[in-house]
Amino acid sequence: MAIAHFSASIVSRGDGRSVVLSAAYQHCAKMEYEREARTIDYTRKQGLVHQEFILPADAPKWVRALIADCSVAGASEAFWNKVEAFEKRSDAQLARDLTIALPRELTSEQNIALVRDFVEKHILGKGMVADWVYHDNPGNPHIHLMTTLRPLTEDGFGAKKVAVIGEDGQLVRTKSGKILYELWAGSTDDFNVVRDGWFERLNHHLTLGGIDLKIDGRSYEKQGIDLEPTIHLGVGAKAISRKAEQQGVRPELERIELNEERRSENTRRILKNPAIVLDLIMREKSVFDERDVAKVLHRYVDDPAVFQQLMLRIILNPEVLRLQRDTIEFATGEKVPARYSTRAMIRLEATMARQAMWLSDKETHAVSTAVLAATFGRHGRLSEEQKAAIECIAGPARIAAVVGRAGAGKTTMMKAAREAWELAGYRVVGGALAGKASEGLDKEAGIESRTLSSWELRWNRGRDVLDNKTVFVMDEAGMVASKQMAGFVDAVVRAGAKIVLVGDPEQLQPIEAGAAFRAIVDRIGYAELETIYRQREDWMRKASLDLARGNVEKALALYNANARIVGERLKAEAVERLIADWNRDYDQTKTTLILAHLRRDVRMLNVMAREKLVERGIVGEGHVFRTADGERRFHAGDQIVFLKNETLLGVKNGMIGHVVEAVPNRIVAVVGDRDHRRHVVVEQRFYSNLDHGYATTIHKSQGATVDRVKVLASLSLDRHLTYVAMTRHREDLQLYYGCRSFAFNGGLAKVLSRKNAKETTLDYERGKLYREALRFAENRGLHIMQVARTMLRDRLDWTLRQKTKVSDLVHRLRALGERLGLDQSPKTQTMKEAAPMVTGIKTFSGSVADTVGDKLGADPTLKQQWEEVSARFRYVFADPETAFRAVNFDTVLADKEAAKAVLQKLEAEPASIGALKGKTGILASKTEREARRVAEVNVPALKRDLEQYLRMRETATLRIVTEEQALRQRVSIDIPALSPAARVVLERVRDAIDRNDLPAALGYALSNRETKLEIDGFNQAVTERFGERTLLSNVAREPSGKLYEKLSDGMRPEQKEQLKQAWPIMRTAQQLAAHERTVQSLKQAEELRQTLRQAPVLKQ
C-alpha cells in the first residue's frame, strides 16, 4: 500500500550543504558549482524517471531569460548558481527540499499528473520556483522538490521576511508599535499547509484512478491507532553511519536499535490486539484481501510462525466479513483472491444511507416561491436548468445533491442558491476536502467555507456548531471517504440542519473509490447540470426539466403525446418491439444506446441487437475475444463498452467505443466524441474488461450523451433512475414496457415516480447486516450474486466450525507469547553477538499459495489448455458461464474426490449441470438439432480436456511450489558477520585486486589458516544465497542497477542497506575465490601436461 512519507529540510551552508550539489544529485546530472569553481558529476546515478523546472506565472523577465533554451537540468544549474551567488552569509539558508513518497498503486504517468497538480496549486500559486525530480527506486517511487525561500523580484530576489497584513488590509503591529514580520516561506505553518495540500491532492488522484485507498498523513496517535511510529533511516543517516563505522564509533547503531525496538513493540501490540491491523487497513481501504493484511504485517513481523498465526487471527476475526471467496475466472482460468470488509464499515455506510433517506423525508427547510422568484429576478442570466437545480436543492428536504462538470455553472447556481437561503433566514456555510476548493466556494459563491477537517475540529471544540437554521454545502463530495461523510451526515441529523452535496459525474461511476457519495445519491436522487442542453427539441427540454423537478408524470405525458412510449402486453413482446425498432432506425453515423436497469436484460439486449446487425451484414461474426465475463466476438463496426478504468489506455468505466479492426484477442477501437476521437488498441492479455455496448445499464450511462436512446422499463425503476435514463439523448428517446406487469403495480407513471426502489432485489438472507453488505458490495462494483452466496456459505461454515473447537490453540498462543516475552517483565536488552552481515529474508508479503496462484495464472501452457476447456464449455452448454459456476470449480481444484465425482456426473448427466445447446424433438429446427448433436459429441471431449487441465495444473503446482520453497530457503540464508581479522584480510585483498596484484591478494588470504577458513565459510554463504559468480561481472562493481534490484527484491529497507554495506566485501570474497579456482585449474593443467611429457612413448 502507499505510504505517507513527507519530509522537509532546509538546504543550508551552515550544515555543509550546497543547493547546486543537491540539484546535481537529484537530476542525476553534471553541473558546474560556480561558487567553488568545481564540477559536480552524478550522471552515473540511476533511477531518474522525470524532471521539471517550473517558474510561477508572474516570474520576472530576468529569470525567464536565465533559463531560456536550457534543458531541465541546465535551468536548475543556472538558477541555483544564481541563488548561491546572491546569498553571502556562511550559514545562509538556500532552499527548502521536500522528499515525498509516491503511491505504487498509480502508474508513472498518473504520478507525474499528481505532482504537477500539487505543484501548480501549492507551490507555483505562492510565487515559488519548483524544481522537482521523480526517482523510481525498486519499491520506492518518490520525488525531490526544491523551492525558493525568497520571492522573485524584478531585479533579483526579495527579503525572506515580509510584513504581516491583517484582515483589514493594514500592516499588523506589535504592542510597541513595531511592524510584525513573518517568513515568506519555510515556516512550520507553511510546511503544514503544503503537507496537508499534498495528501489532499494524493487522495484526489487515487480516487480519479478508481483506487479504493485513502492516505492519512496524520500520526498514528492522532488517528487513534495504538502503534509506535517507526524511524525513517534516510540517506543522510546512513552516510553518518558509514562514517562512524570507519571511525570506530557506533552512534547510528542506537538509532537502528531504537527502530527495531519500536518494531518489536508494535509486534507485541498486534499480538495482543490483531484488530489494530484492521484499523490500519480500513483507514485506507473499504474492501481488502489477504495480501493487504500481509503487507501490513510484513512491516512489523519477522518470525514466519508469528506471521502465519496473525494472518489467521485477523482473517478469522469476528469483525471481518468475507464478501467474495477465492474463485477462478472463467475467461482466463486465473485465481481471483477473496475480498473482505469489516462489519463496522458495512454498518457505518448503511447507517449513513439510512440517515440520508431519513433526511430526504424531513421537509423542514423549504424556500418560498416568492423568495425564489426574487432571486431569479436578480440573476437574470440563470438558465432554466440552473433554476431547476436551485428549486431542487432549495426544496424542503433536509438533504439534496447536485451534479455537474467543471464549467457547467455550478458556482453561479450555488451563489444564487446561497442568496435564496439567506433571504429565507438560513445561515449558509460550506466545506471541502481541499483548502483550494473551499476557498473557491468562499470567494466565488460567497459561502463561508473551511476544509472538512477544520469544521470537525471546530465542532469538537464547541465552536460554529450547526443548528436548524443552517445549510451546509459540501463541495467535491465524491472525494469524501465513507467515514468522514457519515460523520457530517450524522452531525446534520443531530443539529436539525440541512446538507447539500455537490459532485462531479465521474464520481457516480461504479468503481470502489467514492462509494459514500454514490450510496447517498442512489437513494435520494440529484439535480444534474448540462442535461437539457443535450435535447434539441423544445418539448424534450421541457420534459427534462419536469424530470429534474420530480414531475415524472408530466414528462411521461409529453413523451406519450409525441408517440415515444411503446407499451406491449408482455415484457418479452416489448423487448422484441424495441429490438425491431432499433434495427429499423440503426444509423452508423449516429450514436445510439439501449438502456435497462437489470444486468440480465442488458446481456439479452446486447445479444439480440448484435444478431440483427450480423443478419444485415453490417458487422461480421467476428473474432473471439476472451473478456472477463466470458468469450465474446468482435468485428469492425461493433459498439463496445469499457467496464474498468485503465489510465494506460485512457479509458474509463462506462466509456463507449467503436471497433475499427479486430483479430483474435485484439481489437482497435475509436473512443471520444467529434473533435476528441482517438484510437485505442486493446490486447486481451492486458485488458479484458469490456463487452458489447449496444445496451448498457442505466447506472453506467450516468454522465453520458448520445444521439438516440431506447429504454426498457422494468419494475425496479424509480424516479431517480427514470431521470437518468430519459435525459441521455440529444435527438430522440423511446421507452418500452410490458403493460400487464406495470398494470399490476399501479401503472407506468406510478412505478416510475416512486421516490426510491427497494434496497435490493435479492432476498437471500433476512438479516439486516446481509442486506447492508449486499448494498455495500454493489456500490463497489462487486458481483452481488457471488457476494450473497459467499456470505451464506461462510455462515454455514462458521456454524459447523463451532462444533469442533481447536483445543490446543490457546496453549500454542500462550507458548508463543511466553517465547516472545509477553508474560514476563521487561528485561534489559543486550547487544546480540555476531549479528549477521546481511540477514536473510524470513517473512514474505505473500504466502507460497499466493505466489503459486499468480504463477499458475501466468503459465502459457495452462492458459492454452484452459482455452480448450472454456471452448468445450461453449460447444456443450447454452449458457457456459452459468454451467461453469454450477461445476463449482474451486472445489474441483481443491478436492480430488470431488473432482472425480463432478467429472463422472458431467459425462453421465451433462444436463444436470446446465442446459445443453440446441434442442431435440419434432419442434426443433435443423440448426437446433445439429447444435444438440455437436453438444453431445463434445461432452466426453470436455471431460478429457478438464482431466488434462487438472493433471497439468497439479504438475505445474508441484513444480512451482518446489521452486518457490527452494527460492525462499535460499534468500533466508544469513550472510555471517566477519571477524575484524577476516575483514582486514579482505580489505587488503581488495586493495591488491585494485592494483591488479592477484598473487599478493592470494598471499594475504593464505597468511592465516583460521582466517582463510572463516573467509571460505563466508564465501560459501554468499554463493548459496546469491550464486557463485553473481558478483564478478562489471555490472556488479557498485550496488545499483538491475542486479542490485534483483538481489534486494523482497528486502526491508534496513536489509537493503545491509546489502549495500556488505557488497564490496562479498564481491572481494567472490573475486578471491574465482582467482583461487583459476590458480587451481592452471595447476591441474600443468600437472597433466607434465604427466603427459613424462609418459614413455612407444615407437613402431
UniProtKB/Swiss-Prot annotation:
Keywords: ATP-binding, Conjugation, Nucleotide-binding, Plasmid
Residue intervals passing through the bilayer: none
Xref: CDD domains: DEXSc_RecD-like, SF1_C_RecD
Binding site for ATP: G404, R405, A406, G407, A408, G409, K410, T411
A matching Pfam family: Bep_C_terminal
GO molecular function: ATP binding; DNA helicase activity
UniProt family annotation: Belongs to the MobA/MobL family.
Record-given protein name: Conjugal transfer protein TraA
Protein's organism: Agrobacterium fabrum (strain C58 / ATCC 33970) (Agrobacterium tumefaciens (strain C58))
